[in-house]
Amino acid sequence: MYRIGEALIGSGNEVAHIDLIIGDKEGNAGAAFANGLTNLSLGHTPLLSVVRPNLMTKPATLIVPKVTVSCLEDADKVFGPAQTAVARAVADSVEEGIIPEEKAEDLVVIVSVFIHPEAEDYRKIYQYNYGATKLALRRAMEGYPSVRKVLSEKDRGSHPIMGFRAVRLWNPPYLQVALDLDSMEEMERIINTLPDRERILLEAGTPLVKKFGVGVVRRIRELRRDAFIIADLKTLDVGRIEVKMAADETADAVAISGLGTVESIEKAIHEAQKQGIYSILDMMNVENFVDKLRGLKYKPDIVLLHRNVDLETLRAERGEELGEMSEWGNIREIKEILGPRGLVAVAGGITPSKMQEALDSGADIIVVGRYIIGSRDVRRAAEDFLEHMPQDPDTMRLPLDEDEAI
């Protein structure tokens, strides 16, 4: 039996990132410990963690450098402040009861340590690695994080080294701005004018894609690096190729026409799943779209419904119950088919005064085109809709509050 812990503390070149395993000396952890100590790797030579020369810590701890140690200067950082920090963190964890003292002889710890080659401040190297090791040990012994914690955080944060946010639609509602334009200059002007809000999704409209190609998505990305960008391809055929083209240009989602055959739609949705992007099934002019959706083996992530003024009359003529009906159809029925993660977008002449009705009907995404892009005051027009939505997720969340609750 062994436990796993991880922690990142600090900033700059002295930042500490600790990965560790703690487990029984007689089990898999002990075997890994012995293997690491006896099978040396050039530039990554493991060393026992000592509080001071001739006094190794308990539980016995093996330090493995993550970054290649290429010179004596690098070795000094590992054998000096990093080794001391890890040893004292382990010993203090025993003293504080994080590691049971009675188990200290029966356990071993393997600590993978990151030391940047350009780190210079030995005090910071010590401080950050001490804190990170101790935190990683506590997390390992307490089983942090829980699966529920991981699921609740996976779409919220961003990795500092990655340099950008991979946006996921985890907290609707959202405002999708349809850039149905034929001018690159006008597109750039509108994007630069829109509020920088997480709740705004940018759609490369069909006219833009037809005139400038799917590469227009990358231009939008240059203007709004962390935006959620939709390529409105209205794919009818060869869906796999078109979806891959959109994904290659960094689109987060691609719109597929619901008028296509079941086979074509499923291939496009499957390709979107392979590429790791959202699939949007556009039900414009699709009759019996509920039946079509039910017949799909692979369900889309999002269904786009368009305002149909004749729908209510048609259902009434059939003698069907209208209680759950909206101008876009029975949104809640669509959601039941899609499952708990499915989203519904609605489009068609929506104004700020009409928006609340759409949200109350169950819509997750409000698609707006002319009201915003045709406005003399694009920013104000977008804010008219955003006023009906909650603040962006985590607006009031303090830094570091994403970690353990205490």
UniProtKB/Swiss-Prot annotation:
Protein name, entry field: Bifunctional enzyme Fae/Hps
Residue ranges of the region described as Formaldehyde-activating enzyme: 1-161
Keywords, in A-Z order: Carbohydrate metabolism, Lyase, Multifunctional enzyme
Functional description taken from the UniProt entry: Catalyzes the condensation of formaldehyde with tetrahydromethanopterin (H(4)MPT) to 5,10-methylenetetrahydromethanopterin. Catalyzes the reversible formation of ribulose-5-phosphate and formaldehyde from 3-hexulose-6-phosphate.
GO MF assignments: 3-dehydro-L-gulonate-6-phosphate decarboxylase activity; carbon-nitrogen lyase activity; hexulose-6-phosphate synthase activity; hydro-lyase activity; orotidine-5'-phosphate decarboxylase activity
InterPro entries in alphabetical order: Aldolase_TIM, Fae/Hps, HCHO-activating_enzyme, HCHO-activating_enzyme_sf, HPS/KGPDC, OMPdeCOase_dom, Ribosomal_Su5_D2-typ_SF, RibuloseP-bd_barrel
NCBIfam families: one_C_fae, PRK13307.1
Source species taxonomy: Archaea, Methanobacteriati, Methanobacteriota, Methanomada group, Methanobacteria
Stored Gene3D superfamilies: Aldolase class I (3.20.20.70), Formaldehyde-activating enzyme (3.30.230.60)
GO biological process, one term: L-ascorbic acid catabolic process
Reaction equation(s) it catalyzes: 5,6,7,8-tetrahydromethanopterin + formaldehyde = 5,10-methylenetetrahydromethanopterin + H2O; D-ribulose 5-phosphate + formaldehyde = D-arabino-hex-3-ulose 6-phosphate
Entry EC number(s): 4.2.1.147, 4.1.2.43
Family affiliation: In the N-terminal section; belongs to the formaldehyde-activating enzyme family.
Protein's pathway: Carbohydrate biosynthesis; D-ribose 5-phosphate biosynthesis
Binding positions for substrate per the UniProt entry: 19, 48, 66, 68, 83
SMART domains attached to this UniProt entry: OMPdecase
